[in-house]
Amino acid sequence: GFGSLFKFLAKKVAK
């Protein structure tokens, strides 16, 4: 779902 994708991107940009 889109929610999962958003969470994935959030983790990627999280530093």
Swiss-Prot record:
GO terms for biological process: defense response to bacterium. Keywords: Secreted, Toxin. Coiled coil: none annotated. Its main location: secreted. The keyword Repeat does not apply. It comes from the Eukaryota. Expressed by the venom gland. GO terms for cellular component: extracellular region. Pfam families: Cu (PF17563). It is found in: Secreted. GO terms for molecular function: toxin activity. Signal peptide: none annotated. Belongs to the cationic peptide 04 (cupiennin) family. 08 subfamily. This is Short cationic peptide-1e.
